[in-house]
């Protein structure tokens, strides 16, 4: 009876956590690749059986944890996104580890379901009988003695496929071993790349003193630029129109990438489209340029707390920042952006020297509930309002309703309420307090949001690996100032580049505003064109496969189709 129960639980573990294998087989079709696919599955099933019947208790426990955890992560990912988790997705999840509480709240039902399927595996591997007691298995007892070492075979097999196919080829492979193969390939690749290259110092010529008193960059979170009132009739109220003639709207812009960490990293180091992977390691940071230009550097992080860093920021980079500000954990999510607005207003009012301020706003990362007050519901119906705690990463959000159409309507309405509050309230506080006669403020966002309006399954809003829909890369791009000389240049820039700008153009524009020689900027291939130059027709592209290796090519996506890609 125990033997039968053990086999049933193992089958539940393997088959239940590997959804879509049949569809994957159909996709591969009758070709040599199907033989490789089947061979890996045979290896995986055999090694799972060996570890389940291994006589040594410590060996079973040692392998239970990685096998179950890898299964849980990959299966949860598939339940949430309706896609297999690949190597690039795995790396993105590691980069987004700080947002894990968001997932535990919003997708709690799917996580519980995945956990129950994986629990079957944990029980099956560790319950009796074992090889030394299961009479029919004494003939293979020699193999179970080496069960721990033999677990490496499917890991190496999947890793070899990943390595030879540029990080691809793991779709439909056993989730029990995929994650371990991802770790191996990532580690081997890092070892082969060797130590990181040294960063270059700032070599760009500067004209002298800082020409503008305060330069502020606001990198909002998860904002679709085409849903805002500045770009859409009857769009979401942002409060930006109150800036009147000081508002220079470049329309919808393309982000650097469709994921927060990639966009923020690329932005802070001023990468170009052609060499971004090298430049994130070798370029001087925006802080270095600002300090050389005579600016005091300030970073306001509205998302993390207690010194936790995000978006690939390192302790070395932090040392370039004169004032590093994170918010008190007692602030509720919907209180954070208004608090930042008041903090910024005070900074601008009391500054006694030139300052460069970079802000990562709280914004509207999912889940959207808890990021606006209960009395600020304009778009209805919404997801159920609930208290999410005081952390930057909210938890315990009510799960979606069963009906997909109703869920999607509520999902999007909650998002619209969130951006209405977090952008609108921010600028309602900041604009009256700003002296735009000596300040330039740039407002954009790290990526857009995909609401699957075309009926595609899943609730993945951004960070798609591979070809991505345009909505993931559509962000706003606005500049606020009333400095006459700058306003004249911006007016000309908007006339030339409305709905043509990219975030890649913002960094060199900031350097020009800081007083770096524009002729040097124009003549250097180390920078994209500024917003003051006429931008090329195919300028609005964003990355959805950012970190590439093993011969794989990055994936670029347009937010507007203007001919062949």
Language-model-detected regions and their locations in the chain:
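Histidine-centered active-site microenvironments of extracellular/periplasmic hydrolases
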Residues: 231-236, 437-487
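C-terminal, low-complexity/hydrophilic appendages and adjacent surface loops
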Residues: 546-565
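Active-site-proximal alpha/beta segments of enzymes that process anionic O-linked groups
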Residues: 154-396, 474, 502-535, 540, ...
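A short beta-strand-to-alpha-helix junction
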Residues: 277-284, 401, 409-420, 464-473, ...
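A long, amphipathic alpha-helix that forms part
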Residues: 178, 199-203, 384-441
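Metal-dependent active-site segment of extracytoplasmic phospho-/sulfohydrolases and closely related
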Residues: 216-217, 418-462, 510-514
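Transmembrane and membrane-interface helices of multi-pass
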Residues: 1-174
């Amino acid at each position: 009876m125990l033997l039968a129960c053990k086999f049933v639980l193992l089958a539940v573990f393997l088959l239940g956590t590997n959804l879509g294998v049949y569809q994957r087989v159909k996709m591969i079709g009758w070709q040599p690749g199907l033989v490789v696919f089947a061979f890996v599955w045979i290896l995986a099933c055999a090694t799972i059986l060996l570890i389940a019947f291994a006589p040594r208790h410590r060996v079973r426990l040692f392998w239970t944890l990685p096998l179950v955890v890898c299964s849980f992560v990959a299966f949860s990912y598939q339940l949430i996104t309706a896609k297999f988790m690949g190597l690039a997705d795995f790396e993105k999840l590691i980069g987004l580890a700080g947002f894990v509480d968001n997932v535990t709240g919003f997708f709690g039902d799917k996580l519980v379901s995945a956990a129950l399927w994986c629990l079957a595996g944990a029980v099956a591997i560790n319950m009796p009988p074992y090889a030394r007691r299961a009479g029919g298995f004494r003939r293979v007892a020699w193999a179970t003695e080496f069960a721990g070492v033999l677990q490496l075979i499917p890991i190496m097999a999947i890793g070899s496929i990943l390595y030879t196919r540029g990080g691809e080829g793991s779709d439909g492979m056993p989730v029990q071993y995929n994650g371990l193969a991802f770790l191996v390939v990532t580690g081997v690749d890092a070892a082969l790349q060797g130590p990181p290259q040294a960063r270059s110092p700032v070599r760009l010529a500067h004209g002298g003193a800082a020409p503008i008193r305060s330069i502020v960059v606001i990198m909002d979170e998860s904002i679709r630029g085409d849903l805002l009132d500045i770009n859409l009739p009857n769009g979401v109220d942002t409060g930006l129109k109150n800036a009147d003639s000081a508002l220079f709207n470049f329309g919808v812009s393309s982000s650097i990438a469709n994921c927060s960490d990639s966009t923020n990293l690329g932005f802070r180091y001023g990468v170009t489209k052609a060499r971004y992977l090298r430049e994130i390691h070798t370029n001087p940071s925006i802080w270095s340029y600002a300090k050389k230009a005579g600016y005091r550097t300030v970073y306001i992080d509205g998302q993390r707390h207690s010194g936790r860093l995000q978006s690939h920021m390192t302790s070395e980079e932090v040392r370039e920042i004169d004032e590093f500000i994170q918010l008190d954990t007692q602030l509720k999510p919907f209180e954070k952006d208004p608090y930042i607005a008041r903090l910024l207003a005070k900074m601008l009012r009391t500054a006694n020297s030139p300052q460069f301020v970079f802000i990562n706003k709280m914004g509207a990362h999912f889940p959207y509930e808890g990021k606006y007050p209960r009395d600020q519901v304009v778009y209805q119906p919404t997801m159920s309002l609930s208290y999410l705690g005081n952390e930057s990463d909210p938890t315990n959000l009510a799960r979606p309703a069963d009906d997909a159409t109703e869920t999607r309507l509520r999902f999007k309405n909650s998002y619209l309420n969130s951006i209405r509050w977090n952008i609108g309230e921010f600028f309602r506080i900041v604009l009256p307090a700003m002296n735009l006669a000596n300040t330039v403020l740039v407002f954009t966002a790290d990526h857009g949001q995909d609401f699957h309006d075309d009926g595609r399954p899943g609730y993945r809003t951004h960070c798609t690996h591979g070809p991505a829909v345009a909505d993931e890369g559509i962000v706003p791009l606005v500049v606020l100032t009333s400095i006459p000389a700058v306003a004249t240049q911006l007016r000309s820039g908007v006339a030339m580049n409305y709905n043509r700008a990219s975030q890649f153009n913002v960094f060199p524009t900031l350097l020009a505003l800081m007083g770096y020689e524009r002729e040097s900027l124009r003549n250097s291939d180390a920078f994209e064109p500024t917003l003051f130059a006429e931008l090329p027709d195919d300028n609005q592209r964003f990355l959805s496969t950012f970190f590439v290796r093993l011969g794989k090519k990055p994936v670029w996506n347009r937010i507007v189709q203007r001919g062949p890609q």
